[in-house]
A protein has these predicted regions:
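Short Cys/His-rich "knuckle" micro-motifs
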Residues: 38-42
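Glycine-enriched alpha-helix->loop->beta-strand junction motifs that scaffold or abut catalytic
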Residues: 95-97, 170, 199-201, 225-231, ...
Length: 376
């Protein structure tokens, strides 16, 4: 390598030099587990150098799609109640500054409205506290998921309980709403909740069904149109190649969950950004209790950079677009992480700590260290 200094990303290396260094070695790419060739590594090092130069040229780090913000990530769909604090620590190191946790099905149907009330209290209360103790801002969406809408008595009781949570701090939308099996009871619950979102001036996060996805997505958008809900205030999530064009054509935000076994993979996501551009596209992990990855957004961003997707486009799909739509009701604000509160793990939530016996509390004052630049 030539021109190396201690500054992050301050190096240059040509493909020929890398060929010599890597001769006879087989390396795996940390982003996609594919072969790491000299050409691919050279491109990655070049991207790092370019992004670092852009950051150094903008000391105020204004939100322009370059500099430090190019390395910041919002994961706008992460079921953190199902994850450990190790995941929060790993996400923070990867550049995640904020997560949005949608209310969802826990893997087993709830049998009483009290279970739902406790769950809503958890994701709007303790989970928000827990994330903050590890340097990540936490927001949530509140709603009755379609899978449990088929228990009519439970669904009606839950919908009656929603208003008390829709006004809580950190609630940025209603969701996940939509269809699972596309039954009449799911339709009834969806329509009631759309009207609640209009009443409380909240955006909506839509869950599209795993089965018969295209038909369910089109039906959902038809219902939203019937209720005169503004597409610019609605995120249609779990999209794929079958649904993207129609969702974009109708003016909705189009989100993709990097959940390779059932939803979307990183390579496919990169190809969609290349084909359709970044406008109104959002990348999330949908990490939960299943086989999923809380670092999926960061890994996808790296893969897109390796494939030559521009820094501005990457910034849009992993940060700017999510902030634009989920910041509409004012609960999510970029200043929450640009001027963060102190981290003090001595703090308790209703008498409880995030630590266990023998652990040393982490205490940090506002502001990020000077060497905090993260290249995605």
């Amino acid at each position: 390598m030539t021109g190396y200094s201690s500054a992050v990303g301050s190096f240059a290396c040509d493909a020929g030099t890398l060929q010599k260094l890597m001769a006879g070695r087989t390396l795996a790419c940390p982003c996609c587990d594919g072969p790491l060739t000299a050409e691919k590594l050279s491109r990655l090092l070049s991207d790092v150098q370019r992004l670092t130069a852009l950051a150094n040229d903008r000391p105020d780090h204004a939100s322009t799609g370059v500099g430090r913000h190019a390395a910041m990530i919002i994961d706008p769909h992460a079921h953190m109640i199902s994850r450990t604090t190790d995941d929060y620590e790993a996400m923070a190191k990867a550049g995640v500054v904020a997560v949005i946790e949608p209310a969802f099905w826990l893997g087993q149907p709830r049998t009483s409205v009290g279970s739902y009330v406790d769950y809503f209290a958890m994701i709007s209360g303790f989970e928000r506290f827990r994330a903050g103790q590890f340097g990540i801002r936490h927001y949530c969406t509140i709603g009755l998921n379609p899978k449990e809408a088929n228990n009519e008595a439970l669904a009606e009781a839950v919908i009656d309980a929603l208003p008390r949570f829709l006004v809580k701090e950190g609630v940025v939308a209603m969701g996940e709403l939509g269809y699972d099996e596309q039954t009449s009871l799911e339709d009834k619950a969806l329509r009631k909740q759309i009207e609640l979102a209009k009443e409380y001036l909240l955006p909506i996060m839509i869950h599209t069904p795993h089965r018969d996805k295209r038909a369910g997505t089109l039906r959902t958008m038809d219902v939203l149109k019937e209720h005169k809900f503004d597409p610019a205030r609605c995120v249609i999530d779990h999209n794929n190649e079958e649904t993207i064009r129609e969702v974009l054509n109708r003016g909705y935000w189009c989100a993709f969950s990097i959940y390779p076994q059932t939803k979307m993979g990183s390579e496919r996501m990169a190809a969609l950004v290349e084909s359709f551009g970044p406008d109104r596209l959002i990348v999330d992990s949908a990490c939960d209790w299943g086989v999923s990855d809380p670092l999926a957004v960061a890994k996808t961003a790296r893969l897109m950079a390796q494939r030559g997707v521009g820094a501005d486009a990457i910034h849009q799909v992993i940060y700017t677009n999510a902030l634009a739509v989920y910041g509409l009701n004012g609960e999510m604000d970029e200043q929450h992480w640009l001027a963060p509160a102190a981290i003090d793990q001595r703090t308790l939530y209703e008498g409880n700590s995030v630590l266990r016996g023998g652990q040393t509390p982490r205490i940090e004052q506002p502001g990020r260290p000077a060497d905090d630049l993260r290249i995605v």
